[in-house]
C-alpha cells in the first residue's frame, strides 16, 4: 500500500518561501560591503618557530583573489597568494578546495628576526586591466623574539706585562626584543663596564650589544679568566650566555734570573743559572764567557709552577785551573721575542793558579814546551842522583882507608925468642910475617960473616870485584933469620934487608 502523496496545491506555497529566503540571503551578501578581518593586532613568536596570521572575509564578492603583504606602500613585500607561485615557508591554513571558502589565514614556518613586521591581508577585484586592490585588513604586527648570539670576547693584540691595564670587548647580536643585560667578571669578581651600547636605538627586527671593560693584570693571572654574561627574555630564566677570555693569551710574565757557582770535583766549578717564573715558555738561554758566546740552548724541559708560570735551570761546568785571570760568566735569556736579559757571575782565580800555566788546555806549542820541561827535569834528577851516589861512594872509600890504613912497622925482635935459621947459599930468601914497631931499623952489625938478602913477602886477600880499592897489609912481625955471627978479623961487606909488599888491583 503506497503512502499518500501531498497534494500539488500544498507544495507550491513551500517552494515560494524557500526561494524568497534564498534571494534574501544572496542579496545581503552581495549588496553588503565586504569586510577583511584580521583578529590579532599582534603576534609574537620565537625565532625558529612557526607564526600563524589569521584573515577572513565576509563576502566572496567582488570576484578576485586574496593576497598577503608585509608593510605598506610601493615598497611593501609580497608574501603569499594562493593562485601565485608556491612559497616554501608560507602555507594556507584553510582547505583551499572547499567551496565558498572565506578563510585566508596563513602559516609562516622557521621564523627569523627578519620576518618581524606588519602583515596585511588584501582583497583584490578582478577587472579587465587586471587585479585591482579592493579592500585591506587592518594588519597584524608580527614580532620575533630572538635569542642573542653567544658573546664573543676580544682582548689586546699584543701581550702585556703585570701591572698593565688592558681592554676587553664583548659583543652579541641578533636578539629581539631590544632589552638586554650584560655583566663582566674576573675570576668570579664582578667588573665594571667602561662602556656599553645597544644598536640600533630605533625599532628594528634585531639588535646587537657591545661592551668594554678594563682589566689590571697581575703576575698570578696566567690561570685567570675574564667572563662576559648576557641575559635576555628569550632565555626564559635559564642561565645567561657566557663568553670567556683566558688571560694566558694576553699576559707575559718576564723571567727573573739567579746565577750561582759551587765547587765540583777537582778544579771544576759548577755555575748554575736559574730562570724563574716566566710565561709563556718560549725561551732561549745563552752562556757567555768573558763576553764571548760559549753555548746556546733552547729550553725544552720546564718545571711548571702552581700559578702557571715556568722555571728552567741550566748548568755550566768551568775548569778553574784553565784560567789565569778572573772569568766573567753571563747567563743571557731571550723570552717571547723581547730584548734579552742577563746576569753575571765572576769566577775568581786563586794566586797559585795565576802563577802557573798547567791547568790550561794545551795547544800545540804548550804541549811541546811541557814535554821539554819534563825531559829536562828527568835528566836533572838523574844527574843529581848520580852525583849524590858518587859522593857517597867516595866518602865510604875515604872512611875505609882511614880505618884500615896503619903504618907498616918493621922491627927486629930478640934473637932468642923466635929464631928460624935457614942455611942456604949467599942469596937465600927468607919470608916472614912482619909486624914491625915504629922506629928506625937496626943497623946490621959489621961482624956478620955472611952476605945474604932477606925478604918479607906479604900477600893481601883479593878485594871485592865491584870495588877498586887499595889493600894495606898489616905487618905483624918480621923475623930475619941469619946464621950465627962469626967473629971476623975484618969487617964484612954491608947487606940489605927488604920488605916486599905486593898489592893486587882490580
Swiss-Prot record:
Phosphorylated on tyrosine residues. A motif (SH3-binding) lies at residues 441-446. Gene3D superfamilies: Immunoglobulins. The modification Phosphotyrosine is found at residues 431, 455, 472, 498. Residues 30-371 are extracellular. Keywords: Disulfide bond, Glycoprotein, Immunoglobulin domain, Membrane, Phosphoprotein, Repeat, SH3-binding, Signal, Transmembrane, Transmembrane helix. One of its GO terms (biological process) is positive regulation of T cell activation. Residues 393-506 are cytoplasmic. Pfam families: C1-set (PF07654), V-set (PF07686). Binds PTPN11 when tyrosine-phosphorylated, except in macrophages, where it primarily binds PTPN6. Binds GRB2 in vitro. Binds JAK2 irrespective of its phosphorylation status and forms a stable complex. Binds SCAP1 and/or SCAP2. The resulting complex recruits FYB1. Binds FGR and PTK2B. Interacts with TRIM2. This is Tyrosine-protein phosphatase non-receptor type substrate 1. It comes from Bos taurus. The gene is SIRPA.
